[in-house]
């Protein structure tokens, strides 16, 4: 991580599920706390898989967090003594989180966000792509494909052990029983319009 000469910037940590995003966010938070910086950690209220008031990684590490229902609530908890603002599972917030993050960085806060850059369909997830484009630093992590062991950049949703349809809801909170990390070649999305179109064109090609 390079050193900023000015205070106030945005760091994005992204990748598939089980790639270590929350673990990396927690590591940066603890490092800031060790340096005697005041850190405020936030998470969407919708994410209560492991704890309602903590960010918990899949390997069990955790840090106390403030659950918020919408991005605008974050500012209510920021004070002049705050140095670092960290937001986990940022993909669950609406696009307004981009404005909140921009304002905080412009005002001199170090902002760290972590989230999925792709949804289970393999498509850009919520505000994360925009946050990546405006960030000073982007760390894209990879997991390990559960099928072949290759680097995994996608998240496979499983319903009763079977790949979920493209038309399933995008937001469905789950943990290891609902999702697996997959590589490009083993990521399955039944009923995907683009893939169905490609298959049809291939079948009709002379």
UniProtKB/Swiss-Prot annotation:
PANTHER family: THYMIDINE KINASE, THYMIDINE KINASE, CYTOSOLIC
Cellular component terms per the entry's GO annotation: cytosol
Transmembrane segments: none
UniProt keyword annotations, A-Z: ATP-binding, Cytoplasm, DNA synthesis, Kinase, Metal-binding, Nucleotide-binding, Transferase, Zinc
Name of the protein in its database record: Thymidine kinase
Active site: 89
Family to which the UniProt record says this protein belongs: Belongs to the thymidine kinase family.
Gene that this polypeptide is encoded by: tdk
Gene3D superfamilies: 3.30.60.20, P-loop containing nucleotide triphosphate hydrolases
E.C. number(s) listed in UniProt: 2.7.1.21
Ligand binding (Zn(2+)): 145, 148, 183, 186
InterPro entries the record matches: P-loop_NTPase (IPR027417), Thymidine_kinase (IPR001267), Thymidine_kinase_CS (IPR020633)
Highest taxon in the source lineage: Bacteria
HAMAP family noted in UniProt: Thymidine_kinase
The reaction(s) this protein catalyses: thymidine + ATP = dTMP + ADP + H(+)
Record has Endoplasmic reticulum as a keyword: no
Location of region: Disordered: 183-206
Broadest EC class assigned to this enzyme: transferase
Quaternary data: Homotetramer.
Organism: Anoxybacillus flavithermus (strain DSM 21510 / WK1)
Residues the entry annotates as binding ATP: 15-22, 88-91
Localization per Swiss-Prot or TrEMBL: Cytoplasm
GO BP: DNA biosynthetic process; thymidine metabolic process
Molecular function as annotated in GO: ATP binding; thymidine kinase activity; zinc ion binding
